[in-house]
Amino acid sequence: MRKASRSVGAAPKVPANNKSQATERSKSESSAPTASKVSRPGSSLSKAKSNDDLLAGMAGGLPASNSVKVKKNSTTSYPNSGTAMSGQEGRTRSSAGSSSNTKRSGSSGAKEVGSSRERLRERSRLTANKKPQGLGVGTGEVSAPSKRSRGRTDSDMIRMSKSKSDNQISDRAALEAKVKELMNLAKNKDAEILLLRTELRDTRSQLGQDVSDKSPDDLPLIHLQEQNTTVCEELQQLKSENRMLKDRLNALGFSLGQQPDDPDKLYGFQSLGINPGSHSDCGGGTLTSSVEGSAPGSMEDLLSQDESTLTGERRSSSMDNLDSECSEVYQPLTSSDDALDAPSSSSESEGLPSTERSRKGSSGNASEVSVACLTERIHQMEENQHSTAEELQATLQELADLQQITQELNSENERLGEEKVILMDSLCQQSDKLELFSRQLEYAQALLDEHHIAYSLDEDLKSSRYLDLEQRYMDLAENGRFEREQLLGVQQHLSNSLKMAEQDNKDAQDVIRALKERNHHMERIAEAEQLSKQALAATLEEYKATLNSEQGECARLKALLEQEKQRVAELYSIHSSGDASHIQNLLESVRSDKEKAESLASSLQEELLHARTDVNRMQDAFGKLEDEYRAFREEAQKQVSELTLALEKVRHELEEKETELSDMKETIFELEDEVEQHRAVKLHDNLIISDVENAVKKLQDQKHDMEREIKILNRKLREESAEWRQFQADLQTAVVIANDIKSEAQEEIGELKRQLQEALEKNEKLAKEMENATSRKQEEERGRVYNYMNAVERDLAALRQGMGLNRRSSTSSDPAPTVKTLIKSFDNASSQAAAVAAAAATPISRTPLSPSPMKTPPAAAVSPMQRHSISGPISVAKSLPGLSEKRPSYAEIPVQEHMLRSSSSSRSAASLPRVPAIDNAKSISVSRRSSEELKRDISVPDGSSAPSLMVMTSPSPQLSLSSSSPTASVTPTARSRIREERKDPLAALAREYGGSKRNALLKWCQKKTEGYPNIDITNFSSSWNDGLAFCALLHTYLPAHIPYQELTNQDKRRNFTLAFQAAESVGIKSTLDINEMVRTERPDWQCLMTYVTSIYKYFET
């Protein structure tokens, strides 16, 4: 425990608030989740309140038990603190134990300080007056040895942890109850906001005036705007303070994410000590922090250090440190996003003067913050986000197309490389032949020189010998040609005869094959008949045997009949002589036997008759089959004999044809040998040499051409590959930055929505006042509206001139945004946000509910087709309700959105200044540009003079950004480029404007619709949802079909119907559904871009 008494001569001085922050950090961490839960639902409501309301609300949410406990602890801790400093060592366990109550009271008081400024000041004065009384003895008796025991039971530790956990539980319950209350209040406010919106809309429609009318009833709204501005500034201040405190905690080695598991770990920080000798040397105002390794100090050391810190600070009578401690204790309870719920103690220490200064500083910008402004700003940010997403999708689509084109170019390059290798091989072969023929020519010349034979070409041409040789050669060539033709005719005749013979042979073979098959078929039929005949014979034999058996049975039955007759006779004789009854029985039995025998005989007789009829029928069928078989056999034998004769004849003819064919082949071979001999004679060395020389010249020319083309292709391939890699890197960077911007925009949109909700809560007061003002001052308001309309018309007339000049200068000087300029603008946006916000103030003063100053567009631009028929610009009459329907100026648009706008047609007099990254023109376009165009792009200054409003109908000189795309540069001729443009009409447009095809088409649409009112084309979705953009685009080509002056953005169906009918009248098929376009606010940008592309293709290609 004595290691904290080390000398502090070289130790740096540490402010007292750091130690207080270290001791209270565990309590703030344990209550941080509850505080964050409270801060989020309450942030939107607290912004609408004043500073006093916020303080009262936060003070009312804390339980009253904490304040009672604080006062009790503070009154009981002073005797203990006086006794603690009586010993020689001020950091013994006894002094630390007596100061533990002081620490608890200090931490509880610090937690309540963040809620109420008045209670904080009273408590700080109390402790400042009482603690020096108890510490006066302690400082005088520093050198006296301490006699108290260092024993301290664990019951104090358990009691401290229980009291601390009880405080946290009570605080959490109170905060949860406040969260529920604030949630219910937020739901009620939402319902009131909806009701207020409907009442405000009805009131506007009843009054028939614009929101920009200024009346004495707008004073509460001005007060609301001032409060909103003050709250926003306090929010920024609290965020900066929170960030500073986090940095200080990190510098001290503490992390806000630490959550101790048990109460003992709450004090597991680095041990902080005080040197008693430094109090006597420096008057008790010097504080030290001795950090020895990472060994955690005891709880008593930490509490005694805090007591010494507070004592030294009370002696120096510095209230700023106490306020800083309170802010550091309370500040970790809130996050940077919800810092509005926690009142800033540093701003509280400044008091009323700081509030007055902040209100004075924000009074100049109070007129710009209103409900309509916030709504329009959110709308602009959403439009910017959708435009960015649409542009990224189009860029990825074109990236896939470029990858496919690159693959095709690579395959074409490989094919050209293979052809180059083939040509090089052919050239080498021809070179070898040329060298061979040159050696032969030299050898022939040497032979002629050796034999002293003149070989001059002129003499040979003139000599008769050369003429005779030439004539003989011509005769021989003619005879050879004639004989060759005759031989070819004979060969053709013989080949035809051979084909005919082969065909006849094939037919004969087919007939023989058919006859053989028929013969086999007949033989199979005869065999089948033979088998049936044998079966019939067997059946007949069976029937004969049956007949014989039946005949024997009949003879036996006849013998039995005779026997029975004899017996009957005997019976009659017996009957006549014997008993009559007995004889009668015998007769009946005999008669029954007789009947049975007769029935059996009749059945056998019938069976015999059936058997005889079957035998007769079988014999007849067998005879017929024998006759048919005999006739068929004779006919088959006759056909076989005839076919055999025909086969022999065909074989004989085939043998004759084969002999003739062999003879013809021999003749053909002989004729071919003669032809070859004539050819060998015909081919002379002079003709061969001349042919070879011509071929060598041609090949050399082809070689030079191919080498030149190969060099050009290699150079272009290297350039395109370098550009492609740069484009991929730029695109990846742009995608990453766009995602970051998107997330930041979403966060800002959420915050703005909360601010809007808070601002709209105050509109409830205005509803009743506006209703009363409607009944009492309707006539007065109408007169005021009339006067205000005249004033606005005068202001707009002044704006029309200045903004027209501004617009023309920005249109002619702004280069087309590329990927690099987009990236640089994103990088510079954050650093220039403050300067741009200061420069964005509009020069025209207006009321908080008045609309932002709009641009007055110049006269409508006249297309080249209309210049011969339209002499003057299109005049546009503007009314006050029309101004409220238009979109706001660029004064409230962030720098990122301003840079993403590809058109400058909607810039107002208060538009944001251009980012220097674009003005310097240091970016390089993704597509290739020529050096002259790049110099022209760089040489155009930002402040270049623009033409006046009177000459707006003439075409202004635009910055030439024409460039050749990678695919167009590969094609060698203009005809192939025309074919490519017909295949992809946007390729030429991308070369003309630079950048992607989507951006090029967007710039073309902006250029065509320049000067038309109510047109602001920034994307291919929401900018076209009212149909006016289609009508303006087609009006430049078909003015007779579209009465543009009669159109409004309210009647969408009529606008789309007129535009589609005008396009279909010239043959442009409509691919969009009118019902779908009228129903949706953001149509599919790909379908819409396809339709605009078809319009461009029809009128421009």
Swiss-Prot record:
Residues 1-170, 280-366, 923-978 are annotated as: Disordered. It is found in: Cytoplasm, Cytoskeleton; Cytoplasm, Cytoskeleton, Spindle; Cell junction, Gap junction. Residues 29-48, 64-86 have a biased composition (Polar residues). PROSITE patterns: CH. The keyword Cell division applies. It comes from the Eukaryota. Its main location: cytoplasm. Residues 995-1100 form the Calponin-homology (CH) domain. Residues 114-125, 151-165, 929-939 have a biased composition (Basic and acidic residues). Gene3D superfamilies: Calponin-like domain (1.10.418.10). Keywords: Cell cycle, Cell division, Cell junction, Coiled coil, Cytoplasm, Cytoskeleton, Gap junction. InterPro entries: CH_dom, CH_dom_sf, F-actin_Monoox_Mical. Residues 162-254, 373-427, 492-785 form a coiled coil. The keyword Transit peptide does not apply. One of its GO terms (biological process) is cell division. GO terms for cellular component: cytoplasm; gap junction; spindle. Involved in cytokinesis and spindle organization. May play a role in actin cytoskeleton organization and microtubule stabilization and hence required for proper cell adhesion and migration. May interact with both microtubules and actin cytoskeleton. Belongs to the cytospin-A family. This is Cytospin-A. It comes from Xenopus tropicalis (Western clawed frog). The gene is specc1l.
